[in-house]
Amino acid sequence: MADRTPLLRINDLRVGFDLPEGRLVAVDGVSFQIQRGATVALVGESGSGKSVISQTIMGLLPRSAKVFGGSVLFADPNKPGTITDIVRLSPNGAEMRSLRGGRISIIFQEPMTSLSPLHTIGNQIREAKGMKLKLLLD
């Protein structure tokens, strides 16, 4: 029987920015999950929280941002049975750095500056993975 544990599960995520006038809520109670092998696109209006959600998943929130609720649970296929709450990791800690780029990656909002229109997305991803593998082996 195949493992049906979601690869990534976002539960009631709440992220905001504490300002002198009070808290500006950027993400308010967002929940979704991503199954193994799935490709997901976060789509929404400008200012809807897509980038903040992505930055939270990657552990790349700016210092002015704060996760004040929820969880981002990652079930690493390389560590069966282990679920890591990314929100609880130190953004600059060894565990987060090992996940970022190697296990979890994101293409941000401006695909024309991130991707080449002359090559398929699949080829570009394969090339990036090959370059990372080469760096690891060197």
Task: Annotate the PLM regions.
Residues M1-D138:
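ABC transporter nucleotide-binding domains
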